[in-house]
């Protein structure tokens, strides 16, 4: 061979495959490659001890057993290599000669399908007879050119064929040796050697059955062709021997039946001996009724017992092996079925199984037979499942093809009379029964196998559950019953593996190729119960492992005395044992007597290696069970059984078993309780888990067991194939991650079920606590209700009776969901970390991330509905509902989930530091990771409310303090998302960061609008200056001409209205913030309010004072929100920095000439105008005040800078008034200028032909005086008599509140040109609302900006411009604070006489018609002006 091997005798010999001839009989050392490191080390140590040890007989006999164990390991190694070859070749079909495209691209065989496939089909014909040059000369030439390269790729697999051939010869020799020399192979006498013998027998069968799955024929033929092409047409040395070997095992079962014919009688004896244990394991009723797997006494449950049937229960641990012996034994030794007792044994096992596993997930099946004759299919797994690669041949078809013909032949021979008549009749009868059994058992298996195993799984579920409860309560009884625990684990292991081995199998009832899938229910909940029971039982054993070791040590200590006593009995003395055997017995006693005594809690500290004891006992067994020994097992039993106690060998076997509980308890537990083989079905495992975990019978606590299975998956990897270790570990990690994903998906599902309209949402639609209290109070007042009618006056049932009985199921569903949620959270919280390779999975952390991640996803999902933004109040209720569920789960975990939810809300709300509080910048790494939710909400408010990009007709309603729309904005009207309750919900959700973000966005938007105003102011400066001069000079013509030339006046008005909307919205937001702060942090709110009252009034303001004012303005406790807000904007953008801003009053006064007034009307229901022009008043007042503050602040800064430079003396800087008073006086002066000239323009523009806009403009000016804290209400009185305004308001408020003033034709009469219709005109069409007092009381509470009474109105007329601003400022602050209370009465609240006159049904003329025909009104005012 090209690849040298470490066990070759020399380098030269190892260079050629022919060296196998010199290595065939080297013994176990030649198999080092197929053994693990531990087994290889034991081989070398055994060889060295053999050379040193003088006890030739004993050590040689013991070495034979070691060889048996090694050959079993070699079989696993050979099958691992074949399994790997099949994987590389993408699972070919060598029987049907079907090879995929991936097969040829794998790099093992030359990519010349025609020649290679022909060689395989024509096996065993030599290639020289096939005339390959005629088949494909090009491929043949290519093979000749690359022969050496192809030989190197095939040599490792040719060596595998040689090793298979050598294994056959050595294994057969060992099997023959054991069969011919061991005098007894009964489970109760010689179980250790029996298991070694049968394990080797089954391994031999499996290797040769599995060998057919690799392309042996093609491998040998192609290799020989390449060898001949490169060696002058000379065949390789081993060609003919391999041809004979492969041909003899084609098909494998015929070769196996011939090779194993010589051991057939011994196999039949063994299978008959294990029959009782198989019958017992199949009888679930007997197992349950007689308590074979129960620590309770079968007939007296109150009496505790070690085990009802200790020996038989212990033997149940081996039933899985016994079943495999039966299935494979009768398959390769069919003559043994003709025993009378064998029929029932085979029937029981065949009825329960459809397949036999060969290696890992490979099963004993012939693909050709399945596809061509039986139509095998897959019904359980998905199309991409790994199990699609499994090559199925059903077990029953194997029996029909290879066992039934032998039975029929025996039947024919018996019928022909070739044997004695009596024996012939018996043989014929038995053969006929076997024939009937084989023919019928297939149908029975298809119908009953799943039912049988489901019943067995239910039994094991119950018994293991009882065991766990019992041993948890009585741990001291676990150690004596440890063998019974192993039996229960082994049976459960067998059932779980059977379930997944048969998942996806489909069979046929006849040769008509009708595919009948085996009904393996993927929703079977018993699998989860078994996994959980096994896991908990193993945990109990590990928990009390010291107690089990202590019990075993005490048993062995007592066993030493019993064995010493038996060695001194007369029978043993009379046997005259040879020195070798006697020495071994003495060493056994010494081993047992040298065991340290178990004392109290020091058991865990005892280290005791009993491997030498077990080796010596195996040596004794090999001697006394050998037919060549003068003293055999029967002699020893007869010599010691007369004592009335256990025989010598029985004592030794029991001591051997208990010794394994001292130093090999973990390996014993792993053997019986490990489910590592489930790795090969892990995709099915995942499917069943998902179907059952959260099903009606699923249990949250089972997820621990499903996950812990993965820890043992990497143990399935073969050490001789290094890449498997990595792959299996990676698959185990992926399996755990997949299950964790399913578990967390289920956890999310439970939370989402509760957090739905059908969950806790349905409870929210029931009676509120106040309603329930009223309902109970009402019910308690009913005396002695009738029994027949439990209803009360309101139609409700009395307490104790169901109002909606159909809701019972929903309530029970909620209770079940809550129970599952709390159980699952508790289980995940208490679960130990899952360790797979170097990965550690802590389920508590996954649960935390799941709950918090689910909350974040649901929060972001609930943020927007299908139509548009979710209402903040609804979003808040959803958050509270979800947090209630999280709090429910939090009670069962040791984690602070509430803190995590707060962090999520903070993360979604934090878009940067609060501008008025923080001085740091937002970290760069948080630019894209925080504030996503608040950005969505703020952008929506900006686009749909402030900017109205959808054109929904957004209007601000001062009276109700919200924005309204003429059509829905998304899914809601604007009023349902902008009132104070909704904004307070927004503040509670997003906190100060959300408020600041929305405030900053409105500031940026308003800054852009103010910049447009400044741009227009500068571009029209000359025209505005000319208009201002003409206004002062009284030149109306020049004024009108200049105003008409101002560019884009209507556009600027639109900008100002939009800025006013932003001011109004920010004012609402500040009020909502203040209300929330007062509710949740009243001390902080009162502290801010107190600080604002004592802030020093100075210009320029210090940075700290400015920040405090910003905070106060943000929570609605500042004196003037609008002007302070605009002032901050102008300071940030550097506005109002030139003299053009002094023209603002004149520029704003020119707005009175705009066409916007022609399309507006006042609406008393909203307290505003139909085109939102009342927001212009806020903008004008705020911009004038803000710009004046900024202008004066800059002047003072410049003066102080000049003073510091020594240009002026300090006396020049002294002022008569404080800077704040000066600023307020300047603002008041500018506002009075605006009012004066605006009123002048309004009244001058009125004429008989154009008077429809007059009322709107007058109301606008009145509202401006009301809004501005710097103007007295009487400011307009000097220009427009208040009798006119009172008449206008009386006309509006005595009519229908929702009737706006629309555009009227200039040709209408005066009474119609000023209003829609007078009350007298409305009387015929619209019913009166009642008396004036009634109408005023209806409209008064929510009339918006207007002051409360006539005294308050006219009390302000005594203020003049020369009054000091300090007292004015204090009054303005107080008025601003009381705006929501004292100004709610509206303009009609002048006096009772006015109310009565304006709203009565008297026949006298109404005030507005009197004003319309009077010449003492606006005309005389205009002339006076």
UniProtKB/Swiss-Prot annotation:
Pfam families in UniProt: Nckap1
Signal peptide: none
InterPro entries reported for this sequence: Nck-associated_protein-1
Tissue specificity statement from the Swiss-Prot or TrEMBL entry: Expressed in roots, root hairs, hypocotyls, cotyledons, stems, leaves, trichomes, and flowers.
Superkingdom of the organism of origin: Eukaryota
Disordered: annotated span: 1-24, 1299-1425
Biased composition (Low complexity): 1362-1405
Gene Ontology BP, a term: multidimensional cell growth
GO cellular component, one term: SCAR complex
Compositional bias ranges of the Polar residues kind: 1-20, 1299-1312, 1320-1329
Family, per entry: Belongs to the HEM-1/HEM-2 family.
Function field: Involved in regulation of actin and microtubule organization. Part of a WAVE complex that activates the Arp2/3 complex.
Subunit structure: Binds PIR.
PANTHER family found in the cross-reference section: MEMBRANE-ASSOCIATED PROTEIN HEM (PTHR12093:SF10), NCK-ASSOCIATED PROTEIN 1 (PTHR12093)
Official protein name in the record: Protein NAP1
Organism of derivation: Arabidopsis thaliana
């Amino acid at each position: 061979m090209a690849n040298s091997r470490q066990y070759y005798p020399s380098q030269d010999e190892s260079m050629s495959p022919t060296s196998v001839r010199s290595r065939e009989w080297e013994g176990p050392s030649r198999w080092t490659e197929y053994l693990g490191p531990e087994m290889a080390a034991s081989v070398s140590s055994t060889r060295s001890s053999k050379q040193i040890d003088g006890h030739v007989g004993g050590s040689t006999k013991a070495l034979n057993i070691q060889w048996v164990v090694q050959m079993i390991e070699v079989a696993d190694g050979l099958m691992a290599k074949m399994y790997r070859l099949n994987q590389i070749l993408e699972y070919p079909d060598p029987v049907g000669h079907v090879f995929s495209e991936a097969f040829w691209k794998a790099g093992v065989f030359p990519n010349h399908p025609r020649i290679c496939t022909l060689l395989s089909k024509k096996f065993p014909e030599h290639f020289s007879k096939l005339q390959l040059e005629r088949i494909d000369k090009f491929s043949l030439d290519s093979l000749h050119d690359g022969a050496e390269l192809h030989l190197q790729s095939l040599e490792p697999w040719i060596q595998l064929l040689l090793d298979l051939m050598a294994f056959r010869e050595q294994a057969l020799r060992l099997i023959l040796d054991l069969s011919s020399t061991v005098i007894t192979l009964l489970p109760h006498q010689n179980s250790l050697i029996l298991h070694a013998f049968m394990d080797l027998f089954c391994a031999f069968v499996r290797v040769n059955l599995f060998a057919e799955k690799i392309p042996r024929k093609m491998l040998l033929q192609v290799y020989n062709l390449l060898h001949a092409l490169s060696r002058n047409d000379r065949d390789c040395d081993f060609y003919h021997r391999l041809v004979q070997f492969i041909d003899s095992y084609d098909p494998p079962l015929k070769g196996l039946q011939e090779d194993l014919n010589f051991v057939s009688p011994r196999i039949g004896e063994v299978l008959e001996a294990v029959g009782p244990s198989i019958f017992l394991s199949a009888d679930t009723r007997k197992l349950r009724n007689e308590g074979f797997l129960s620590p309770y006494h079968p007939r007296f449950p109150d009496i505790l017992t070690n085990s009802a049937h200790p020996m038989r229960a212990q033997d149940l641990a081996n039933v899985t092996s016994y079943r495999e012996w039966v299935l494979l034994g009768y398959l390769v030794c069919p003559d043994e079925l003709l025993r009378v007792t064998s029929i029932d044994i085979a029937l029981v096992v065949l009825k329960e199984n459809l397949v036999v596993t060969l290696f890992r997930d490979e099963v004993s099946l012939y693909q050709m037979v399945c596809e061509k004759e039986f139509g095998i299919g897959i019904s359980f797994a998905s199309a991409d499942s790994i199990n699609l690669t499994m090559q199925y041949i059903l077990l029953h078809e194997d029996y029909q093809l290879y066992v039934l013909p032998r039975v029929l032949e025996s039947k024919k021979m018996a019928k022909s009379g070739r044997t004695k008549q009596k024996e012939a009749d018996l043989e014929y009868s038995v053969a006929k029964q076997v024939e009937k059994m084989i023919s019928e058992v297939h149908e029975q298996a298809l119908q009953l196998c799943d039912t049988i195993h489901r019943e067995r799984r239910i039994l094991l579920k119950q018994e293991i559950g009882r065991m766990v409860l019992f041993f948890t309560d009585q741990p001291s009884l676990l150690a004596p019953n440890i063998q019974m625990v192993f039996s229960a684990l082994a049976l459960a292991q067998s059932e779980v593996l059977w379930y997944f081995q048969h998942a996806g199998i489909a069979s046929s009832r006849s040769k008509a190729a009708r595919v009948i899938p085996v009904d393996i229910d993927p929703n079977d909940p018993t699998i989860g119960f078994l996994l959980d029971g096994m896991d908990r039982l193993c945990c109990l054993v590990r928990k009390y492992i010291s107690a089990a070791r202590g019990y075993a040590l005490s048993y062995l200590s007592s066993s030493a005395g019993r064995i010493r006593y038996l060695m001194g009995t007369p029978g043993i003395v009379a046997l005259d044992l040879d020195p070798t055997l006697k020495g071994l017995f003495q060493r056994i006693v010494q081993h047992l007597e040298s065991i340290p005594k178990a004392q109290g809690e020091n058991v865990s500290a005892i280290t005791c290696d009993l491997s030498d004891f077990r080796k010596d006992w195996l040596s004794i067994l090999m001697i006394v069970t050998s037919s060549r020994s003068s003293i055999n097992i029967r002699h020893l039993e007869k010599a010691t059984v007369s004592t009335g106690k256990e025989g010598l060998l029985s004592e030794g076997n029991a001591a051997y078993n208990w010794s394994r509980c001292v130093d090999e308890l973990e390996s014993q537990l792993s053997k019986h309780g490990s489910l590592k083989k489930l790795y090969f079905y892990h995709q099915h495992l995942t499917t069943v888990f998902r179907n059952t975990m959260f099903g009606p019978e699923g249990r949250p606590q089972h997820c621990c067991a499903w996950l812990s299975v993965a820890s043992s998956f990497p143990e399935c990897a073969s050490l001789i194939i290094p890449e498997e270790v990595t792959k299996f570990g990676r698959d185990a990690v992926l399996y755990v991650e997949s299950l964790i994903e399913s578990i967390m998906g289920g956890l999310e599902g439970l939370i989402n079920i509760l957090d739905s309209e059908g969950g806790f949402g349905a409870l929210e639609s029931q009676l509120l606590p106040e309603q329930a209290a009223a309902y109970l109070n009402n019910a308690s007042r009913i005396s002695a209700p009738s029994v027949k009618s439990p209803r009360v006056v309101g139609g409700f049932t009395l307490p104790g009776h169901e109002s909606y009985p159909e809701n019972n199921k929903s309530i029970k569903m909620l209770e079940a969901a809550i129970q599952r949620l709390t159980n699952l959270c508790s289980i995940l919280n208490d679960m130990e970390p899952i360790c797979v390779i170097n990965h550690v999975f802590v389920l508590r952390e996954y649960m935390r991330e799941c709950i918090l991640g689910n909350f974040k996803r649901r929060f972001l999902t609930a943020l927007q509905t299908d139509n548009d933004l979710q209402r903040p109040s609804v979003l808040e209720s959803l958050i509270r509902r979800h947090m209630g569920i999280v709090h429910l789960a939090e009670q069962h975990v040791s984690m602070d989930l509430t803190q995590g939810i707060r962090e999520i809300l903070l993360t979604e709300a934090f878009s940067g530091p609060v501008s008025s509080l923080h001085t740091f910048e937002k970290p760069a790494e948080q630019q894209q990771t925080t504030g996503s939710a608040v950005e969505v909400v703020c952008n929506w408010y900006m686009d749909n409310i402030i900017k109205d990009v959808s054109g929904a007709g957004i209007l601000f309603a001062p009276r109700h303090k919200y924005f309204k729309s003429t059509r829905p904005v998304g899914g809601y009207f604007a009023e349902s998302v902008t009132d104070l309750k909704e904004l307070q919900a927004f503040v509670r959700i997003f906190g100060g960061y959300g408020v600041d973000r929305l405030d900053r966005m409105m500031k940026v938007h308003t800054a852009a609008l103010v910049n447009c105003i400044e741009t227009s102011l500068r571009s029209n400066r000359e025209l505005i200056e000319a208009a201002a001069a003409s206004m002062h000079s009284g030149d109306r013509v020049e004024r009108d001409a200049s105003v008409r030339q101002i560019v884009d006046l209507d556009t600027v008005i639109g900008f100002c209205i939009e800025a006013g909307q932003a001011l109004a919205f920010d004012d609402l937001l500040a009020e909502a913030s203040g209300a929330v702060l007062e509710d949740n942090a009243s001390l902080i709110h009162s502290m801010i309010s107190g600080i604002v009252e004592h802030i020093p009034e100075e210009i320029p303001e210090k940075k700290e004072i400015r920040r405090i004012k910003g905070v106060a303005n943000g929570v609605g406790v500042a004196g003037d929100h609008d002007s302070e807000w605009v002032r901050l904007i102008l300071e940030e953008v550097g506005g109002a920095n030139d003299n053009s801003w002094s023209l603002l009053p004149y520029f704003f006064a020119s707005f009175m000439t705009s066409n916007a007034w022609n399309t507006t009307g006042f609406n008393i229901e909203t307290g505003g105008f139909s085109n939102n022009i009342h927001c212009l008043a806020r903008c004008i007042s705020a911009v004038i005040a803000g710009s004046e503050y900024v202008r004066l602040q800059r002047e003072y800064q410049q003066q102080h800078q000049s003073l510091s430079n020594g240009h002026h003396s300090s006396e020049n800087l002294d002022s008569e008034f404080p800077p704040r008073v000066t600023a307020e006086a300047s603002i008041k002066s500018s506002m009075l200028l605006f009012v004066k000239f605006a009123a002048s323009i309004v009244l001058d523009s009125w004429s008989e032909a154009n008077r429809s806009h007059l009322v709107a403009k007058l109301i606008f000016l009145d509202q401006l005086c009301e809004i501005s804290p710097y103007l007295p209400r009487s400011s307009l009185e000097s220009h427009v008599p208040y009798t006119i305004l009172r008449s206008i308001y009386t006309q509006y408020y005595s009519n229908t509140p929702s009737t706006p003033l629309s555009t009227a034709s200039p040709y209408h009469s005066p009474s119609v040109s000023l209003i829609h219709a007078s009350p007298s005109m409305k009387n015929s069409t619209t019913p009166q609302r009642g008396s004036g007092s009634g109408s005023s009381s209806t409209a008064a509470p929510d009339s918006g900006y207007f002051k409360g009474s006539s005294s308050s109105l006219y009390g302000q007329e005594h203020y003049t411009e020369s009054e000091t601003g300090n007292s004015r400022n204090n009054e303005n602050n107080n008025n601003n604070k009381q705006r929501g209370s004292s100004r709610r009465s509206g303009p009609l609240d002048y006096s009772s006489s006015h109310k009565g006159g304006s709203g009565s049904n008297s026949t006298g003329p109404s005030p507005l018609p009197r004003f319309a025909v009077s010449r003492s009104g606006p005309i005389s005012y205009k002339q006076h002006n």
